[in-house]
Design a protein with these regions (language model features):
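Polybasic low-complexity intrinsically disordered regions
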Residues: 32-33, 49, 83-199, 208, ...
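Short, positively charged, Gly/Tyr-enriched micro-motifs
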Residues: 32-97
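Short, hydrophobic/amphipathic alpha-helical patches that form generic packing surfaces
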Residues: 40-50, 267-278
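Helix-centered, glycine/charged polyanion-binding patches within enzymatic domains
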Residues: 186, 191-249, 253
Length: 278
């Protein structure tokens, strides 16, 4: 009887091989050579996948022989080592890891759906916050571009809310366009993305400011969206809502880091490990 392989082992293997392709083994010639950079990066990605703290991840690795074998670790990295590794994570590195993975999978999409979702700035429960009377007037946002066919995250970025999603439109478009059908792909999004940078063919419902629509191009776009709704194509937007739900259920709906710069990295990390997961 064939033994079933753990999902954790599969994720560790994909993350480790991905990091090996992108990152050099050591940061400098006189590195201690106890761990390679790909090993440590893969451990941090796996830490977010299993939703463990730095200290708990150290203990989890001690009990996970199959994962240790997959990562080729000769010893277990200390929790402080994992912390320093995530500190070295830069958004450019995360985006390079994402591009490398997607270039291997080669998605080619006709429709790409944009959406944002909010992440709590604290790990405290809603009950605790209600009892102590503490309120937060902001949250962190992850903006994701999801392919309709592949349901992969083709582009991701982070920001802070509350606020309009219009600022996410063009950055997501620039990052995702390499995975769209040349000259044919289109953007699907809700009216929160209704910005002046909208292009011809974008399926984004215009906002009725004052209840009346006067500009011909906005009326034309409203008719285009209405036709797409009748055809059922605009209904494919639900796929990005599913992706948002998976990210929050599997990897948490909160931001764990206390450092401001690392807080903005976490929504992008969650997008990367989602692609590794699926």
């Amino acid at each position: 009887m064939q033994k079933r392989e753990s999902k954790y082992v599969i994720v560790a293997r994909i993350a480790y091989r991905l990091c090996q392709r992108v990152v050099a083994p050591y940061s400098h010639l006189k590195s201690p050579h106890r761990f390679t950079q790909p090993q440590l990066l893969a451990c941090v990605l796996l830490m977010f996948y299993v939703r463990k703290s730095y200290r708990d991840m150290e203990e989890w690795l001690l009990a996970s022989d199959a994962v240790i074998k997959e990562l080729e670790l000769k010893e277990i990295p200390d929790h402080s080592t994992l912390n320093r590794t995530f500190k070295r994570f830069r958004i450019k590195l995360l985006e390079k890891l994402q591009r490398t993975l997607l270039d291997e999978l080669q998605p080619n999409e006709l429709g790409i759906v944009f959406d944002t979702t909010g992440f709590s700035p604290t790990q405290a429960s809603v009950h605790y916050l209600a009892r102590c009377g503490r309120k937060y007037d902001h949250f962190y946002k992850g903006g994701y571009a999801v392919g309709i066919e592949s349901q992969l995250i083709l582009a991701s970025m982070s920001g802070q809310g509350p606020g309009a999603d219009t600022g996410f439109l063009e950055p997501l478009r620039r990052k995702a366009r390499r995975y769209g059908l040349r000259g044919k792909w289109m953007v699907l999004a809700d009216s929160g993305f209704d910005a002046i940078t909208i292009r011809l063919g974008d399926l984004i419902p215009p906002i009725r400011r004052g209840g009346v629509m006067k500009l011909p191009e906005r009326i034309e776009r409203m008719e285009l969206v209405s036709a797409a709704k009748l055809d059922g194509y605009f209904g494919q937007r639900w796929k990005v809502e599913t992706v948002n739900s998976v990210i929050k259920r599997k990897f948490g709906d909160e931001i764990r880091s206390r450092n401001l710069f690392r807080r903005y990295r976490e929504p992008i990390v969650k997008g990367l490990i989602y692609n590794i997961h699926v």
